């Protein structure tokens, strides 16, 4: 039996601290959390009578991305305020096994990916933001999992092969202005206020 196990706990955050007073031409608060990973396992078993082989690829990931302007802050920027949280996770997981036996051959594989992603962009309670030209609060999450399993078995009397691929994905993506916060964009050429969230998981 061959096993490959990967555990990832990755946190990225960017913020303007509680109670801060910030002025300037522009303000960008950006958290960008990007992870690419590959987990692979291969097994080979051979025996004169019985050949058994197994391979398991297990990946456990926690991805946390946070961008925010804190509580009771005062922010003023003539040409815009951007609060951006972006999470991008790509996982490749493969497992393969071959069992060869004179009488019985068996090959079994399993590939499992467990992913929890939390992405948030926000203005916290009682934050006052004058973005001048614009206020843009955006949270986006892209989760892309590609896995493969291959099993083979050769036996003079009996052969058995089996593959299992499992994805457990839990994602939460939020963009918001908390209660009692204030957002404004008032210049003559103002683009306005945008609060957007997107979550994409190709399967």
Give the role of each language-model region.
Residues 1-203:
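Low-complexity, glycine- and small/polar-enriched segments
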């Amino acid at each position: 039996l061959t096993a490959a196990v990967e555990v990832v706990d990755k946190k990225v955050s960017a913020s303007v601290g509680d109670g801060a007073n910030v002025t300037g031409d522009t303000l960008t608060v950006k958290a960008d959390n990007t992870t690419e990973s590959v987990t692979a396992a291969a097994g080979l078993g051979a025996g004169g009578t019985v050949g058994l082989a197994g391979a398991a690829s297990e990946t456990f990931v926690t991805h946390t991305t946070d961008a925010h302007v804190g509580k009771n802050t005062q922010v003023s920027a003539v040409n815009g305020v951007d609060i951006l949280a972006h999470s991008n996770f790509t996982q490749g997981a493969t497992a393969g096994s071959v069992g060869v036996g004179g009488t019985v051959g068996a090959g079994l594989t399993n590939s499992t990916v467990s992913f929890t992603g939390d992405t948030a962009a926000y203005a916290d309670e009682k934050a006052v933001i004058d973005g001048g030209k614009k206020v843009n609060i955006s949270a986006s999450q892209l989760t892309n999992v590609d896995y493969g399993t291959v099993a083979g078995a050769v036996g003079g009397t009996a052969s058995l092969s089996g593959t299992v691929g499992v994805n457990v994905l839990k994602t939460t993506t939020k963009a918001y202005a908390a209660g009692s916060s204030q957002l404004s964009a008032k210049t003559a050429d103002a683009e306005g206020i945008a609060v957007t969230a997107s979550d994409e998981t190709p399967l």
